[in-house]
Amino acid sequence: MTTTLQQRSRASVWDRFCEWITSTENRIYIGWFGVLMIPTLLAATACFVIAFIAAPPVDIDGIREPVAGSLIYGNNIISGAVVPSSNAIGLHFYPIWEAASLDEWLYNGGPYQLVIFHFLLGCACYLGRQWELSYRLGMRPWICVAYSAPLASATAVFLIYPIGQGSFSDGMPLGISGTFNFMIVFQAEHNILLHPFHMLGVAGVFGGSLFSAMHGSLVTSSLVRETTETESQNYGYKFGQEEETYNIVAAHGYFGRLIFQYASFNNSRSLHFFLAAWPVVGIWFTALGVSTMAFNLNGFNFNQSVIDSQGRVIATWADVINRANLGMEVMHERNAHNFPLDLAAGEVAPVALTAPAING
């Protein structure tokens, strides 16, 4: 009797690595996009934390007046930020090896570029990873489409806007008060509140919040009773159950009578598509608006648009907003220019809309 032993061919290390990377059985899916996403997001996070805590002041305006943003230099969680790279650097790519020393790199705000480039690349890979996992599970690709809205917004404020303005010093600072400063200056220079695409974004965000609250409250109010009065309603649902957990007919009837019939969805699929599409489209438009304002295609200008029969200006709310814009423009970067161009180029503007009567 003879026995034949057949040696099993072993898969190569690369084949086993590929199988592990693309396996949907892992607790957390990695995927090929994840191979790039993980190191880039780790690098961005590590640099952000270190810079937020200990980075030295940055010469953001390029006029040798450094601005401190880290905790060690006296800031707190609210006032602290990773300060954008210097206006002296402009749009130049500024990695560590381009600086003469590490001190120079820190002084010119090099950490800001390191963080935003790795962050944007990592977020883009996260979007690709969403698509990749959906593809491998046989799902439709709309999750990554929805995620493209916040990714477009981040790309607009961190990359497109600095490119349009000619310097990464105009990018959004990485901090709470820095974000507010960016918003105020953006309004002063571009009148974003009167830009139609920003208005669509406001409708998308606030409308999405409203619709989410309406949907959640309607579903919670029309749950199918599966528990007693002494048990939590949440015990009435078992993960993976085939039965509906709420009565969509009851919810449809309630909302249809509360407003009118056709204001209520009678199709669960179209309802949830609407809940996803409304805020996503709104945020898309805002990102597009910021990207156009980056190249100074600004919001509407209704300044001094109402005049009387003798040609005198009748002040409107648009003129009040314009005064606020001018004030904000004067206050920011106050040492970087001799006189704000918006004020120097226009006619003399009185401080008050009407001169007060002084009885002395």
UniProtKB/Swiss-Prot annotation:
Record's subcellular location: Cellular thylakoid membrane
GO terms assigned for molecular function: chlorophyll binding; electron transporter, transferring electrons within the cyclic electron transport pathway of photosynthesis activity; iron ion binding; oxidoreductase activity, acting on diphenols and related substances as donors, oxygen as acceptor; oxygen evolving activity
Alphabetized Pfam families for the sequence: Photo_RC
Binding site for Fe cation: H215, H272
Keywords: Calcium, Chlorophyll, Chromophore, Electron transport, Herbicide resistance, Iron, Magnesium, Manganese, Membrane, Metal-binding, Oxidoreductase, Photosynthesis, Photosystem II, Thylakoid, Transmembrane, Transmembrane helix, Transport
Residues engaged in binding pheophytin a: Y126
Chain positions listed as propeptide in the UniProt record: 345-360
Membrane topology, from the record: Multi-pass membrane protein
NCBIfam families to which the protein is assigned, alphabetical: psbA
Job of this protein: Photosystem II (PSII) is a light-driven water:plastoquinone oxidoreductase that uses light energy to abstract electrons from H(2)O, generating O(2) and a proton gradient subsequently used for ATP formation. It consists of a core antenna complex that captures photons, and an electron transfer chain that converts photonic excitation into a charge separation. The D1/D2 (PsbA/PsbD) reaction center heterodimer binds P680, the primary electron donor of PSII as well as several subsequent electron acceptors.
Protein name: Photosystem II protein D1
Organism: Microchaete diplosiphon (Fremyella diplosiphon)
